[in-house]
Amino acid sequence: MAATKRAACLIGWPAAHSRSPLIHHYWLRRLGIEGGYSIEAVPPEGFAEFVLHLKTHGYVGANVTIPHKERALQLTEPDERARAVGAANTLYYDGDLLRSTNTDIEGFIGNLDASAPGWDRSPHAVVLGAGGSSRAVVFGLLERGVQRIALANRSIERAQALRDLFGERVVPIAWSDIPAALPGAGLLVNTTSLGMKGQPPLQIDLSALPADAVVSDLVYVPLETDLLAAAKARGLRTADGLGMLLHQAVRGFDLWFGARPHVTAELRALVEADLAPK
């Protein structure tokens, strides 16, 4: 049960290792807002009842994480972004109506804007992976005006499904065709789990990328993946997964607490310290 002050929560199963409370409590302190942010471990069989009585639990809104993102879409009034991505990660009230959105799109684009200003000057991008994170990335790139997205996935059918969803600017390619797609691409994005701690590395020759290209990796454990290290070694600009995690939290905080926070170096250092091996 949340306190009577304005409060939000993260709903997941499991959710104990989330950094969301650290992020939101930092902003509450910095902005002098009386509020709270809790973790609610809710199993799938109890999710619908919990969400439908969110106000009764004392919350003005919530973040939603695995495995509830798709179900949250069905239980709320989703916006265009949540519908396009097929998942909701942020719930908020509009009067008594519970609405939902997906802030991964803003998180991805906001991180690029902060880490690599001018990244969108190139009309071409290459995106690796066709899962849920890829949907958010593709939506954001198209909305920003990218004209051609080469979408590589080991299962070409999943990439074709995203082309069917988002239109002809998305061009499905085989995984083996990635090297041929890199020349002229101003942005390379990894949305897969390759390179994550405990997963195989993502091994791609970046030599064909233009000298002013940007490389983004949604993985944030480790903070510097092999892909980002290779990009930096070539003098390319990079955007890591932690930046996206921080930027995606901004809109939810604004919706719940009525103030738009900033992603600062101090906040990043705080979360980096929490991520460091103990």
UniProtKB/Swiss-Prot annotation:
Entry binding sites for shikimate: 18-20, 65, 89, 104, 220
Residues annotated as binding NADP(+): 80, 129-133, 218, 241
Gene Ontology CC: cytosol
Keywords from the UniProt entry: Amino-acid biosynthesis, Aromatic amino acid biosynthesis, NADP, Oxidoreductase
Molecular function in Gene Ontology: NADP binding; shikimate 3-dehydrogenase (NADP+) activity
Associated pathway: Metabolic intermediate biosynthesis; chorismate biosynthesis; chorismate from D-erythrose 4-phosphate and phosphoenolpyruvate: step 4/7
Reaction equations catalysed: shikimate + NADP(+) = 3-dehydroshikimate + NADPH + H(+)
Protein name: Shikimate dehydrogenase (NADP(+))
Gene responsible for this protein: aroE
